[in-house]
Amino acid sequence: MHDPRESFRPSPPVILDFDGSVLPVAEGERRIPLGSWQEAIRFGCTRRAFSALEAHLEGVLPVDCGCAFMGSGDFHHVTLIPLRRLCRRLPPASLDVVVFDNHPDNMRYPFGIHCGSWVSHAALQPSVRRVHVIG
């Protein structure tokens, strides 16, 4: 059986640039300008707006997206988008998610998704076995 670690090559970091808060981090980084999404997505948004952003990013994120920076803490709920992409490639219950935050971010928010609710959505992904919150 093929061991995926044998062919592992780190991917250049991706910067989802909503607000210009992430300075250059590495040579070869891929910066995706998303300033036009800032107001619709900051802190939280409707499911419709989140789905629209997810569809947009599907067309611009590299297939082998590794480390992704998302700007200030106003946008960390966007973590769910690359996480969902990863989960589509993994078998069920094969991924542990580690969240470093001083809030659990697992609230239920019936009107969409926001910085305090994204972890509850992450936990529902079939590939996610456990979510560990440290902080």
Q: At which residue positions do the language-model features occur?
A:
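Conserved alpha-helical scaffold segments that buttress catalytic/binding sites
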Residues: 2-135
